Each structure stands twice: as C-alpha cells, then as structure tokens.
A protein has these predicted regions:
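Membrane-proximal basic amphipathic "stem/tether" segments
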Residues: 1-26
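Extended, charge-rich helix/loop segments that form flexible
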Residues: 15, 115-183
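Structural preference for beta-strand elements that scaffold enzyme active sites
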Residues: 19-21, 76-78, 102-104
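Conserved, mostly hydrophobic/aromatic
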Residues: 22, 51, 82, 96, ...
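Short, solvent-exposed loop/turn segments at secondary-structure junctions
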Residues: 26-30, 65, 84-86, 110-113, ...
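Acidic/histidine-rich helix-loop elements
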Residues: 28-39
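C-terminal domain-boundary segment and adjacent tail
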Residues: 38-71
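Membrane-embedded segments
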Residues: 76, 80-93, 99
Length: 183
C-alpha cells in the first residue's frame, strides 16, 4: 500500500499520472549467457507479477484513447514488444495469458519469411565464432577478445554501438564482412 501511494505521488501528474509504456524485445525460454540483457521466462514472469500488483495494465489502444480523454487510471502502464521475435508468442504470450495481462506486439514484417535483422546476425556470428579473438581492424571495427560469454557480450555491444546509426547499406555491408571474418 505504501509503495502504491509513493508511486502515485512520484508520478509527474500525481495519482492521475501519465502512461508508462513498457517495452520488451525477447523473452527466452532459459537464460542465455551471451544474451544476458534478454529476460528468461522466470524473470519475465516475476516482472509480470510485480507489474500486475503495482500498476494498472491497460491495452495500448485503450491507453492512448484514455490518455487523450484524461481518463487513465493512476499508475497506468501498457506492455509492448518490439520486433516480433518468435519467443514473444511461444514464451511471453503464455505468461501474459496466465496473468491476464494485455500486450501489444510490433512485428518487423520484413523478416516473416525468414532471414534476420542485422543486429541478430552480428550476435549469432560472434556467438558461433570459435576463435578467442575477432580481428575486424580491416573494416575499422577493431580487435575483440571473444573467448568467454562476457567477452562476446562486450564485443557485441561495442560493434552494434559502432554501426547501428550508419546508413543502412553501410551497416549491412559491415555486417556481412563481420560474418565472413567470424566464420
């Protein structure tokens, strides 16, 4: 009860606060040491229980309408998923249904027939690389230690951070060259 009161008071608009939109990407069946930023099913379920007890979860379309009308409940939140990974349906959806929580899924339709996003290609290329170092100096992305899950995560973060804002063609070309170097 105290936390509910405090969270309402801390909201920029008080008890009739604005909408919090919670964005998720992946929910893995089990923890992945390389993708430790992604939740596993147990972590996701704990978060959903917590959210359900401290927030009023509202479907996104209803939340937007009620926001415009000024009729949102206190501590209103909407749950969303970006990119439309298959695990959203196979892992996250059953947990959401169990807790009767609505969610909105934004699907990257360009990958419905196969293929994967450039960042996932980088992740999987580095994950599959059996070397302990990945030399990408020839494509101006440095040299990276990748002998452990921690090192692979660090390399992935650094490389994605370096190329994510490049023009699409340049980003895709570097991703292809990285894939070749990692194989």
């Amino acid at each position: 009860m105290i936390l509910r009161t405090i969270s309402g008071m801390l909201s920029p608009a008080g008890r009739n606060g604005l909408l919090s939109i919670l964005i998720f990407h992946r929910v893995l069946a089990q923890r992945d040491p390389v993708l430790d930023w992604d939740l596993d099913a147990g972590d996701f379920e704990r978060r959903m229980r917590w959210l359900k007890s401290w927030f009023n979860i509202v479907p996104l379309d209803e939340a937007v309408t009620r926001l415009a009308q000024g009729s949102l409940p206190a501590r209103a939140a909407a749950i969303t998923f970006d990119d439309g990974y298959a695990d959203n349906c196979t892992v996250a959806m059953p947990i959401l249904q169990k807790h009767k929580l609505p969610a909105c899924f934004f699907v990257a339709t360009g990958f419905l027939d196969g293929g994967r996003m450039w960042n996932d290609t980088i992740i999987e290329s580095i994950r599959a690389c059996r070397d302990t170092h990945l030399d990408l100096a020839a494509i101006d992305l440095g040299t990276h230690a990748i002998g452990s899950a921690t090192e692979k995560r660090a390399a992935i973060d650094t490389i994605i951070g370096r190329i994510k804002y490049l023009p699409v063609n340049e980003r895709l070309a570097l991703t292809e060259k990285l894939t070749e170097a990692a194989s």
